[in-house]
Amino acid sequence: NVSKCKFIFWKTFSDPYGVEPDVLILLDDLIIILEAKFHAGKSGVGTSEDNSILYDQLAREYLLGNYLITSRTVLDETFSYFKDFKILYLTKDISFPTSDVKDSIRTLKKYYIGNKVSSANIFWTNWQSIYHILNNLSPNELQNYEKKLVSQLLLFLEKRDLIMYNGFSFLNKYNLN
């Protein structure tokens, strides 16, 4: 059960890693760093030749998550400090973007020498799955404003063809005249 939840959009962290996650989701003692992609992939690849500068976006966000929990940074006065972080990489890929994530982990291990890097902190889903989840929410469990929000999100995802293949349907269900 989650007792506290807050969303922080596009917060810029110039130090220490120069990164701006799309959304920080604060849940009790957990931070979820959401990186959402639509037409572009992650920004940056690898490190500088001397490993002093980290270019890989997911790797920088991983280090940010680690920094936020080890430094006990206060992001909001209603939360004390965080014990763990997760990265949620949201793309329109149909399958897990293996090369993106493997490259980020490889870069982290090269850059972050002497520290443990865990792929268990990195999760992925796609927009199509978000559509499926939203579409299967029970309207009885939602407040009126949530119903409106879900409806608008579903419409947004439909207009961008971010829905899963759902089998064949009979044409007589549609008004084709």
Q: Model-predicted segments: where are they?
A:
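Charged, terminal alpha-helix-loop-beta segments
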Residues: 1-177
